[in-house]
């Protein structure tokens, strides 16, 4: 561990949430390290929808124009049973109060590629892949984040590592 380097924020998890948070913090001048357990992005979508509020956040990240090429407004939703019979159908037409479509469909790998490209444009963000966090230790004015790959120090740690969050369990 480089004892002279303390990041402002360590973000555990590099999906859309971790990447967006890193961008927003980095744009404000904070030194950010993102720790991701996987060495490569997962190639299949998990999330496929966001609403107008998320579109507003992506605009704040500086990726709205890039996202416009990979999203499609979703104006009607229909949920069906196994036989294909409609159980419920409702609309989400038009723009929400933020000025963006109320609902947009996307492919998570495409959205992540857009966000990762933006992260690469911000020099105050460092991404470390292959870092499976195993421990957090509070050292008073900072936290030590440990993994088999090493350890880092940060003033704050944020868990952006999904539903089965390691950070939450520590």
Per-range role (PLM):
Residues 129-143:
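A conserved short coil-to-beta-strand element within the FAD-binding core of flavoproteins
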Residues 12, 152-162:
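Short hydrophobic core segments
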Residues 2-17:
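Beta1/beta-strand and adjacent pyrophosphate-binding region of the FAD-binding site
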Residues 5-7, 148-156:
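Core beta-strand elements of the Rossmann-like FAD/NAD(P) dinucleotide-binding domain
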Residues 28, 121-123:
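Conserved dinucleotide-binding and phosphotransfer motif residues
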Residues 46, 51-118:
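Active-site-adjacent segment of FAD-dependent monooxygenases/related oxidoreductases
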Residues 26-46:
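Glycine-rich FAD pyrophosphate-binding loop
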């Amino acid at each position: 561990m480089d004892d002279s380097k303390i990041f402002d924020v360590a973000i555990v998890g590099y999906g859309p949430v971790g990447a967006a948070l890193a961008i927003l913090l980095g744009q404000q001048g904070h030194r950010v390290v993102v720790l991701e357990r996987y060495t490569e992005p997962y190639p299949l979508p998990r999330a496929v929808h966001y609403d107008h509020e998320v579109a507003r956040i992506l605009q704040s990240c500086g990726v709205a124009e890039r996202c416009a090429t990979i999203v499609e407004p979703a104006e009607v939703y229909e949920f069906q049973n196994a036989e294909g019979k409609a159980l419920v159908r409702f609309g989400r037409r038009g723009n929400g109060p933020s000025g963006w479509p109320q609902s947009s469909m996307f492919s998570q790998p495409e959205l992540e590629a857009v966000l990762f490209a933006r992260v690469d444009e911000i020099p105050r963000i460092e991404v470390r892949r292959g870092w499976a966090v195993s421990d957090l230790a509070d050292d008073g004015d900072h936290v030590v984040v440990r993994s088999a790959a090493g350890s880092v120090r940060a003033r704050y740690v944020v868990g952006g590592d999904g539903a089965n969050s390691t950070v939450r369990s520590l």
